Amino acid sequence: MDKRKELILKTIIKEHIKTALPVGSEGLVDKYNLDISSATVRNEMAELEQAGFIAQPHTSAGRIPTEKAYNFYLQNLSEKKLSEAEAKIFEKLLAKKDEISFKQTAKAMAKISDNAVFWAFHRHNLYYTGISNLLHQPQFSETALIYDISEVIDRVDDIIGQIFNDLKFGPQVLLGSENPFSQHCSAVVTKYRL
């Protein structure tokens, strides 16, 4: 993929993550000050659509990223580094190796990521926090997604039990059809040795 297509695709993904709305060429050019015309962006978007990176949910709508696009985005994402203060907080909490410290770590992770965190101490002992962070995201203005996520939360202990033994050390991204929690969201999972 050439640099211009990559820039357009990453911009579409970022905008869709922020708004949960289909993204149009004119909006991209205006909002992100792209140094190309909206006609050029439309042509590039047509090629990205042919390649399976974006889709048009209905006629005359903008485009939305596909699972293939999100995978590309994650593979090419530069890691966000924790600040020194954040890293020290995690080191201090994880050094204690007790359930209270792990819960505090999960809360800190939820705050920093502005997302939900699920922490399994073992197969049948689960803690979660940050659900309100998750539900404040723009895509949850759709009732169907709220229902989907509430079903996930209702059965999260069963899902954790199913994947617990298959988890590897180091982050794994579960996205779309590869995500046992829900195809409508992504999850980053890892195993941590006590």
Segments (PLM) and residue ranges:
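Short alpha-helical segments that sit at the start of domains
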Residues: 1-10
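Conserved phosphate/pyrophosphate-binding and hydrolysis machinery centered on Walker-type P-loop NTPases
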Residues: 2, 22, 95, 99
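A short alpha-helix capping/helix-coil boundary motif
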Residues: 4, 21-25, 84-86
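Contiguous, well-ordered alpha-helical segments that form the cores/surfaces of helical PPI scaffolds
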Residues: 9-14, 188-190
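N-terminal helix-turn-helix
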Residues: 14, 18, 22-76
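Intrinsically disordered, acidic Ser/Thr/Pro-rich low-complexity regulatory segments
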Residues: 78-194
